[in-house]
Amino acid sequence: MHGVGAGNSRLRAQLVPQALRRLGEKTQVLGPESDDFIRTRLTHSLEVAQIGRALATNLGADPDVVETSCLSHDLGHPPYGHNGERALAEVAESCGGFEGNAQTLRILTRLEPKRTSPGGRPVGLNLTRATLDAVVKYPWEPGRGPTRPDGSTSPKFGVYDEDRDVFSWIRAGRGAERCIEAQMMDLADDIAYSVHDVEDGVVRGLIDASVLWDPAEQERVVADTTAWYGLADGAALGDALDRLLGEEAWPAHFEGTYTQLAAVKDLSSDLIGRFVSSVCEATIAAHGPGPLRRYAGDVVVPERTRAEIALLKGLAVTYVMLPRESEPRYYEQRTVLFDLVDALVENPRALEPHFFEAWKARDESGRLRVIVDQVASLTDQSARQWHSRLCGFLRN
């Protein structure tokens, strides 16, 4: 079974799979082709792991488990970031949908060719139960998530139907409760991309921090943050923006000089340190000095910190993500993935050998899942190469 002989001292050594290497060519917010400076899913994951390890060390959790969870958290993301995720969710609707976090679990426990069971069944990396549980960000099946403030059910989920057995073994009847290591991973992810996506946006000239003193721009950012992340407290977000604008190193008029680049990097480091410290202090105040492992407690995020993280994420939404959703490349990216799925349905022999082997053993619904697995495994660049080889010119 998963976890036999897979001690924590070996976890990082296990995590050199092709799925991790491929993250270097997958979109974070800006595509990897944008600039050498811009973060990819791989560099983002390394930064998340660093933050996660700091949280674990300070709170008495197993740092190897948390770090491995952080390195793993984006393995399931397809080409073209969230745009690609939405496209694959559409084409995979008849076989249970697509969700990057459910795909991550599938890679770790099935798809990554590292270990097999005594009967020859693929078991992925054969990680420990604690490590796999720490990767489960959404511990529920499709349609069974928590109810949101507007009364709808969260569209996120952590497992596909055909992976339910291993999911049940991992979760051991815990319901929707998350272990503290998974909470640390999730928070480390939030901290990393809230800070670093803004840093990337400023350096690339997509975020002009000087306009944020305009009350109309402030209202726009707060409204986008509230709408995108479902937050109701606009006043708290406004206060968070005021605090960020008061930072001495805030890049008010960024022109890319050495001094300004250094100041932006220092600001990122200061914000990350502040967020980690505030969370550790609040969590220790609530639960004592630890150690905090598995289900011994919850990570406590002070409201000020939560608002500042959300506001930074909102800046990336307003000035990077929303404008790019109307760009022609977004439609082109979706077309690439739609075309690839269609082409592989028509010609499954074009699948990589291990995917074709899995395809032959499945029924119709299962075969579509295998094709989606194949397409999701591609990088931004290899998706285009496959499209050129299998489909030719982009259709209108």
Positions of PLM-derived features:
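Sequence-structural signature of the catalytic-core scaffold of metal-dependent phosphohydrolases
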Residues: 1, 15-21, 25, 50-51, ...
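N-terminal amphipathic/basic leader segments beginning at the initiator methionine
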Residues: 1-9
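Glycine-/proline-rich flexible loop or hinge segments
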Residues: 25-40, 67-72, 87-90
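Alpha-helical phosphate/pyrophosphate-handling elements in metalloenzyme active cores
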Residues: 34-65
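C-terminal functional modules
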Residues: 372-376, 380
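Glycine- and acidic
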Residues: 31-37, 69, 174, 253-258, ...
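Alpha-helical scaffolds flanking conserved acidic
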Residues: 8-9, 59-72, 126-135, 181-182, ...
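C-terminal subdomains that position terminal phosphate/3'-OH groups for nucleotidyl transfer/ligation
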Residues: 226-366, 378, 390, 396
